[in-house]
From Swiss-Prot:
InterPro entries linked to this entry: D_Ser_am_lyase (IPR011780), Ser/Thr_Dehydratase (IPR050147), Ser/Thr_deHydtase_PyrdxlP-BS (IPR000634), TrpB-like_PALP (IPR001926), TrpB-like_PALP_sf (IPR036052)
Identification of the protein by name: D-serine dehydratase
Gene (name only): dsdA
Record key words, sorted: Lyase, Pyridoxal phosphate
Top-level taxonomy: Bacteria, Pseudomonadati, Pseudomonadota, Gammaproteobacteria, Enterobacterales
Matches recorded under Gene3D superfamilies: 3.40.50.1100
UniProt-listed Enzyme Commission number(s): 4.3.1.18
Cited CDD domains: D-Ser-dehyd (cd06447)
Reactions listed under catalytic activity: D-serine = pyruvate + NH4(+)
Amino acid sequence: MENAKMNSLIAQYPLVEDLVALKETTWFNPGTTSLAEGLPYVGLTEQDVQDAHARLSRFAPYLAKAFPETAAAGGIIESELVAIPAMQKRLEKEYHQPIAGQLLLKKDSHLPISGSIKARGGIYEVLAHAEKLALEAGLLTLEDDYSKLLSPEFKQFFSQYSIAVGSTGNLGLSIGIMSARIGFKVTVHMSADARAWKKAKLRSHGVTVVEYEQDYGVAVEEGRKAAQSDPNCFFIDDENSRTLFLGYSVAGQRLKAQFAQQGRIVNADNPLFVYLPCGVGGGPGGVAFGLKLAFGDHVHCFFAEPTHSPCMLLGVHTGLHDQISVQDIGIDNLTAADGLAVGRASGFVGRAMERLLDGFYTLSDQTMYDMLSWLAQEEGIRLEPSALAGMAGPQRVCASVSYQQMHGFSAEQLRNATHLVWATGGGMVPEEEMNQYLAKGR
């Protein structure tokens, strides 16, 4: 971006100067509305989420047999919700900032099949596509026991079709593993920041991995191009997919059920704050949408991004969405948080969700490494760097009087609050790689 343009952008949005300087930045969104006002802009409804929920239930018997690690849960891919009181104390001590309320962790990092939040959206979209093909071919009815999809005749049928996706790692992992298991031919287009072990794992499942020297945006574009030349190839579009988004959104009702099981209350007197790491935006956008449908105006969602990849904060704050990239303002999009290394946000998610998100913040790679090692020390839970992005949120919220006033929170409401950090990945990181991460924390 030329200097004059840049200067006028900064004059209009002074916060951009802090982003360019790679400062850890927090922006509380002044444009939030009630769910009732914001919902029409999403273009999806509660019924769409219910349909996704029903589809996953139809596939549960199949998943229970195809992936024995899901059998105990009846073929439902869901993660634990745990309190992390020792980490809460450690954060308070390190940052000299009390966290009012209780700190919880949602362990999507340990979801079965692919060990990340992408096991929600990625697997769901592959299943939805497989169902559509089988229904159209007259091989399946909605009333069938879907475990019949494991038969050789279905493997043969699906082998005529292929799936392609562009990914920094975790989405490719979930789509690759699921597609290969069903019988699709699958190609994952991986960006330069994708971890070697993720590529190796995909190849071990018979997935074709195409590697690029460039970033996520290029991998997605190339994947899209390659798929266009083949009528039997289905491209899963992380930047624009409504189906992926709905796969993530099912998490809202599931979390509501987990809260009920644990006797946790969410209402006006007991607000819920949720902190979601954000790459291109599909995962956190879908989850936040589901949470809003489940808890209404009593849940407050925040997106967390690396200082080197603040694409969603930049897009929503300036209102330019996918018309601007972090590279346009001179930021390199290089971060240890490989799952979040995205320079241009999803225009669909930004426009759909901007009224339903309370804020956005950035944190440095070093902050993620520090919190990664504290969590391992205090709670014995090991995550990948990206997954710690949400962990910086509770201090930002508890330290901001202006945010609390904007929403009229009393001291008592904050004392009764629940702070939920969404841990997005790390359950499958190899030991030696994890030890390197741990060594980088202070």
